[in-house]
Amino acid sequence: MIETVSTAAMPSEQETNATNSPFQTVKTIATLILLLLVLPLNLALTAIALLRSIIIKPFQSRTIAESPQTILVGGGKRTKALQLARSFHKAGHRVILVETHKYWLTGHRYSWAVDRFYTVPNPQTEEYPHALLKIVQQEKVDVYVPVSSAGGSYYDAKAKSVLSPHCTVMQLDVETLQRLDDKYEMATAAKALGLRVPKSYRITNPQQVIDFDFSDAQRPYILKSIPYDSIRRLDLTKLPCTTEPETAAFVKSLPISESKPWIMQEYIPGQEYCTHSTIRDGHLQLHCCCKSSAFQINYQNVDRPDIENWIRQFAKSLNLTGQVSFDFMEAADDGQIYAIECNPRTHSAITVFYDHPDVAKAYLEPDPLPQIVQPLASSRPTYWIYHEIWRLVTHLWSPKQVYERLKIIAQGKDAIFEWDDPLPFLMVHHWHIPLLLWADLQKTNEWIRIDFNIGELVEIGGE
């Protein structure tokens, strides 16, 4: 029987004078009603899956690991954390799932892959590494695999020094993480290794852009915040603008400063790719590559040896240990691959390993594997069903879009639902998200969209 342990109390009562706008309230209530309407269908699906498991379980043999380990997986509300928990569990290991106090309600805690569930303080607090250490010591954890947010990866890197004497930590050290998370520093490091990156400049004052000589530029440039910016990261305004005053006005509208530097980077038009790589002592252990875009949350592995070789050389040269995700562009003009940024943390594309038996080896084996673990050729693309339904409903006037969405649903696989582990699917959509929506009715912050992938309501200024 799965045991879940939460060290968090129920969320504190919101201030009574905090109210939403009428539109936000209607939107939230309407969403709650829609989730309630599909509850009977999902209950039936879960019941069928549970009955199926009861019938076939006696005929299944569970994998017994040669050296069973206890794995602590962080970021428990994210689908990628659930996927890793399932992969470790299927390989015969014991999984402890952890999340912050705010998300004590995560539906993933009900997964049969999870032996115990804990909550901890926010990563930004001084208590965070010590709370993790307490769990590591209490549960005799062998390996900690953080599944961090954009802002949380730094704090998991800091926690590594506290945890390392007690367990293996699959995380970059602070110095390396900051270097890779800094778009300009990453580009500089890659260029020094002879690896292809766009032309890049560190910007700490708008005047640098205003004074820049664009006359010899073969491609336009874009500006990106080096510290993570959830809103402006999607702004791909091309520079220079039509006129110099327009360029100056645009640049001055951005919060550029010494403390909040930006990168001015050559804009590479073409096909974007996202990757996930698990690396130990500079050796690439696990790798996937998927076509991508700013709004895409569908993942299907594609074979790109040139991208794999780029990452392999980079990882070996810097002797990395941890999880890193790179974004690449295949330029439409010259056909070359350019690395545009690195996110030193787990990528949601790891969901394409849902049926691979060797994921645990990639994380736990101390020696290089004879072959890199890559998604099976038979693996289906992954998606999140309610994201797809929303896209379908909002494009009903386009037969092409409707066909495309139905094709994705028919040929792919929901990233949360598993026939032999159905409870997370039910609990995320009818417990986790509804409770977040209910709490939102008492808040002043307005949510923009529901991200079922990371298990939260996306708000301006959020993660």
Model-derived regions, located:
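Peripheral (often C-terminal) accessory segments that flank ATP-dependent C-N-forming ligase machineries
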Residues: 5, 9-10, 361-463
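A long amphipathic alpha-helix within ATP-dependent nucleotide-binding catalytic cores
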Residues: 254-258, 294-336
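A short beta-strand motif that forms the metal-chelation/ATP-contact edge
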Residues: 277, 286-288, 335-345
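Glycine-rich phosphate/pyrophosphate-binding beta-alpha loops
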Residues: 292-298, 343-356
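ATP-binding N-terminal substructure of ATP-dependent carboxylate-amine bond-forming enzymes
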Residues: 2-171
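Active-site nucleotide/adenylate-binding loops and adjacent lid/helix of ATP-dependent enzymes
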Residues: 177-262, 269, 280-283, 293, ...
